[in-house]
Amino acid sequence: MMALIPLKVPAGFYRNGTDLDAAGRWRDGSLVRWRDGSLRPIGGWQARKNGFSAEPTRGMHSWEANDGTAWLAGGSHTELSVMTGSNTVHDVAPSDLATGRADAEVETGYGYGFYGTSFYGQPRPDYGNYSEATTWSLDNWGEYLVACNTDDGRLLEWQLNTGTNAAVIANAPTSNSSLIVTEERFIFALGSGGNPRKISWCDRENNTLWTAAATNEAGDIELQTSGQIMLATRTKGQTLILTDVDAHTARYQGPPYVYGFERVGTSCGAISRRCAADVDVGVFWMGQRGFYMFDGNSVNELPCEVHDYVFSDMNTAQQSKIWAFNNGQFGEVWWLYCSGDSLEIDRYVAFDYK
């Protein structure tokens, strides 16, 4: 009998190039991870709550109130839902919340394009431009929930009273694309006032004061970028701001300028408004054609051995739905996305950062 020869196959899948290029590597698989050099199932999951929202959720946030109550918030294109630790769900969206879109849509409706183009009575051509699926940015201002969705554009606050809907923050700018609460307790309104490059912030610890004066720390700035602001996240004592083309940081420096802004990366823009995850080693995100990490100082592109598989079979029309999350127990970042023929999320790609 011939002796058994141990196979030492490196961890991770390889899907770049041909099958021959992947010789000696794992080629395909799903819902597995490597631990201590061995391939194992991820372990499964279970539903926490059925019927959390009537529509697909495009943004979630969990936090704890001052009394220890656990809360989970999530938003769809029609709802803003909150749930207690006991699984009781309440819709706290304002009654006049702007109706958004469950899916990205081709921009061919009234008002799209320049006046006088194309022929009267003829169908408008599809130029490949899409209105994004509605997504939410959610955060907590102390124990209160603050929220903004891409179609409504107002900054909302919910003060933990399930009998009262979220209310518009007084004096805050409108037509915003998203928000973030900084480590220093300022609210950043991103895409402020409909300007895709503008950031406005309230006075410190006062989210109803937005007009800059010598006696407060409110302010605004227009980023020097050729792109539009997509998202922001807290990391390592600063705020990372991602546009669709580059990356910037905001660092608190006190009056008179309050914040200092610096571009820290180029050609590394975010593919969606939910594509970044902050972990202890930095921020990871998906770009248009790759994956990136900010370590607190600089941006680096991540080597990806499944790059061709992911980006060659993705429904880019629905890329606004791409969602990242941190699976901290296993030191992983996951990205959920739509495959080429799918209107809804049906695939994932995961990166082990430990």
Predicted segments with their positions:
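N-terminal beta-propeller domains
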Residues: M1-F119, E157, N176-T249, L336-Y353
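Beta-sheet-dominated scaffold domains
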Residues: L4-P6, A11, L138, F186, ...
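Surface loop/turn motifs at the tips and blade-to-blade linkers of beta-strand repeat domains
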Residues: N50-E55, V168-A172, I221-T225, R263-C268, ...
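Short coil turn/linker residues within repeat-based beta-strand modules
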Residues: N87, D152, T162-G163, N206, ...
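Beta-propeller fold detector
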Residues: H90-G100, A166-N171, A212-A214, Y259-V264, ...
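Beta-sandwich interaction modules
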Residues: G121-W141
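Asp-box/WD-like beta-propeller blade repeats and closely related beta-sheet repeat scaffolds
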Residues: S131, L160-V181
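Hydrophobic or amphipathic alpha-helical targeting/insertion segments
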Residues: N140-V168
